[in-house]
Amino acid sequence: MPLRNVAEYLERSAARVPDKTAFSDAAGAVSYRQMLHDAQALGTVLAGLPGCRNAPVAVMIGRTAASVTAMQGVLQSGCYYVPIDEQMPEARMRSILGQVHARAIVHTAANEPQARALTDCAPLVSLEEASQHTPDEALLRARREEILDIDPVYVLFTSGSTGTPKGIVIPHRAILDFTAWMTEFCGYTEDEVFGNQAPFYFDLSGKDVYQTLSLGASTA
């Protein structure tokens, strides 16, 4: 059956290669099984928030495996994510959050201080705390079934060099089609170990994340 939601990449790979490393960083590695569990636990928490239905959720981003888990957790809830560089000035963070009207801000223990400065913008959700919840798979499935392939996966903001940063919406279909084309054109397989070359708030990172998840490959 053709895919229409990129969240299915992680689910299918976790079912096929559960114990394989999905993403790794200086702090360690996360398997497909663990990433799916933590993403679904986060998705369950987000799905319980008011107005969190096919809505924007900000993710405080570093170049870590946990950041990928957080992004996938947002998708599991049926929402879409807005990457926020943890090192950008607070004024820029507030500008982005104000434009998208984020329903929540997901953060990790590593960037909690930056997130706490934004508590007046949206509720904070800790990835580590959310991962302790039991995933409600039926709820998440129902939420994702509402999503069309023209709905957003994420919104990236431009540098703002010409004024106010502007949001660029990336839909599910764009990622599904591009990932399928890249796999065919380059002959990628699940044996690949990709190198993450771009920060997750930059468009090129989508290739690193979704090529990996779609194949059941690994990224370091």
List PLM regions with ranges.
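Carrier-protein-dependent adenylate-forming modules in NRPS/ANL systems
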Residues: 1-174, 186-187
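Conserved AMP-binding/adenylation subdomain of ANL enzymes
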Residues: 166-193, 203-220
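Catalytic "switch" loops of ABC-type ATPases
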Residues: 197
